[in-house]
Amino acid sequence: MAKQIKKIAVLTSGGDAPGMNAAIRGVVRAALNEGLEVYGVQDGYYGLYTDRVIPLDRRSVSETINRGGTFLGSARFPQFKDPDVRKKSVETLKKYDIDALVVIGGDGSYMGAKLITEEFGYPCIGIPGTIDNDIVGTDYTIGYQTALETAVEAIDRLRDTSTSHQRISIVEIMGRHCGDLTISAALASGCEYIIVPEKGLDKESLMRNIEDGFNKGKRHAIIAITELMTDVQALAKEIEDRFGHETRATVLGHIQRGGAPCPFDRILASRMGVYAVDLLLQGHGGRCIGIKNENLVHHDIIDAINNMRRPFKEELFEAARKLF
């Protein structure tokens, strides 16, 4: 029989994403309405290790649903891989008699929750919060749609100036090893070429595509590429040297993580926050939440990390490619 849950904690970990505050709010208010006590862990797993734990009430999350970032703070804490660090972190939970933990973040955050679940049998629920949309078991992650809107707006602005100056523009978009954000942003803004990790960078194919565009009468081009694939400044120079056409690279960078979350992310985050509390009250632990075909689902967090594979958006990529 599962232990009765009386106190829970929530933390945000890894890179911030618009909608994290809405998810925290969802967890806190749903838990309070069920008669639970709620604590917030500041600065992610680092705060768990250093005992940065604060009580949360309804006022703590008032006026946060529309705010970007995470008011609890976040941090990357690779030291959490050390078993002694994890042991001390769990002692912090025990100090406050916390019965369960909700973790909002990406795959690194899930790994921390997985280890706490495996090693200490602690009920953890993972909520996917990352603009990269690279978490398995869910169609969308919290923050992705807002980041997409930000990227599209930036590309639209770049197209204005690229058109005016007959310039080739390379736009580097976040996503790490997942091309979802790049593909969707490129499709929505009519980019002439897309380069994503799942397909790799074929420079000769890129050059042929640019040349074909010029032969068809195009006077400018926008190339969307996922971060970490190549030095975009060097690529811009290669293209300019090849065609004698002014080429500039723009790295959108961390601006994609900021700003107020869009309505989709606010709704998704709120639903997932409520669902996390429901799962804990039902006796679930070691689960991660997702959304599939508009329905909330949950998976074993260990299985999600070890065995599940995120499908590549081939249809979207091909649709965008046919519109070059």
From Swiss-Prot:
Broadest EC class assigned to this enzyme: transferase
One term under GO cellular component: 6-phosphofructokinase complex
Domain of life per record: Bacteria
An example Gene Ontology molecular-function term: monosaccharide binding
Binding-site residues for substrate, renumbered to this chain: 130-132, 167, 174-176, 227, 248, 254-257
Record localization: Cytoplasm
Documented EC number(s): 2.7.1.11
Pathway: Carbohydrate degradation; glycolysis; D-glyceraldehyde 3-phosphate and glycerone phosphate from D-glucose: step 3/4
Family label: Belongs to the phosphofructokinase type A (PFKA) family. ATP-dependent PFK group I subfamily. Prokaryotic clade 'B1' sub-subfamily.
Record's function text: Catalyzes the phosphorylation of D-fructose 6-phosphate to fructose 1,6-bisphosphate by ATP, the first committing step of glycolysis.
Oligomeric form and interacting partners: Homotetramer.
Protein name per its UniProtKB record: ATP-dependent 6-phosphofructokinase
Lineage: Bacteria, Pseudomonadati, Pseudomonadota, Gammaproteobacteria, Pasteurellales
